[in-house]
């Protein structure tokens, strides 16, 4: 039996990188990078079974080129994990239209482009699954991160809508909303700030990327789960 192929969009850092590392024993893994080519080449070198492709999710042409490369190499894509995203803190009244649009263009419009390019073939095969990384801020909102929160809420809404739309095509859509996770996005926090965050979490500590990967593996392997937003936050949003 041929191994299925997983495409991890935004797989050179953080949760995406941890996902790539965890999947190569069971799947062929393609992952994308944009501004972190050096990190991507290191991953490709150190993780047998992984293939790195450049992709700028802000460009439909780049996503279409990605599909061509994936199909030349693997013939098809069975699962897509969308980890691409950016975050920043800023008061709403200080946001420019450019700030707002760039956030949406990567976090949600990038997902739209990837699905626009890859989904039709999944529908023809009546097989596939998509997992997108959202955030707890997409559920409860975050002060000074309105543009980020809006983009992540959009991922949850899109996931639920497409899960209904393509259920009869045997394509599953799910998303994961992590809470505080040790990735680059927390790298600017001081030790005191990290301690304060941990104290607000019922389980008493900040999560690791592997905690999110566990959720991804569950969603990949359970064929009876669709339309779900899996919250992995140590109880933070209770």
Predicted feature locations:
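Conserved glycine-rich cofactor-binding loop
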Residues: 12-13
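Conserved glycine-rich Rossmann-like NAD(P)H-binding loop of the short-chain dehydrogenase/reductase
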Residues: 27-41
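Active-site helix of classical SDR
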Residues: 115, 151, 159
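Alpha-helical segment proximal to the catalytic Tyr-Lys
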Residues: 120, 164-168
């Amino acid at each position: 039996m041929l191994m299925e192929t997983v495409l991890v969009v935004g797989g050179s850092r953080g949760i995406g990188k941890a996902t790539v590392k965890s999947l190569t024993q069971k799947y062929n893994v393609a992952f994308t990078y944009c501004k972190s080519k050096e990190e991507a080449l290191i991953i490709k070198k150190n993780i047998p079974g992984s293939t790195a492709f450049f992709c700028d999710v802000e460009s439909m042409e780049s996503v279409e080129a990605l599909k061509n490369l994936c199909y030349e190499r693997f013939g098809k894509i069975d699962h897509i994990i969308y980890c691409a995203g950016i975050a920043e803190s800023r008061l709403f009244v200080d946001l420019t239209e450019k700030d707002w649009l760039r956030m949406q263009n990567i976090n949600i419009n990038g997902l739209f482009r990837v699905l626009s390019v890859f989904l039709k073939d999944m529908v023809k095969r009546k097989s596939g699954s998509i997992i997108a990384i959202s955030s707890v801020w997409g559920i409860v909102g975050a002060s000074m991160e309105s543009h980020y929160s809006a983009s992540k809420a959009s991922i949850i809404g899109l996931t639920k809508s497409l899960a209904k739309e393509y259920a009869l095509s045997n394509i599953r859509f799910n998303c994961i909303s992590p809470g505080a996770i040790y990735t680059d996005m927390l790298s600017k926090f001081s030790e005191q700030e990290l301690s304060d965050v941990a104290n607000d979490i019922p389980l008493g500590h900040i999560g690791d990327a592997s905690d999110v990967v566990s959720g991804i593996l569950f969603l990949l392997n359970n064929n009876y789960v669709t339309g779900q937003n899996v919250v992995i936050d140590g109880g933070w949003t209770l």
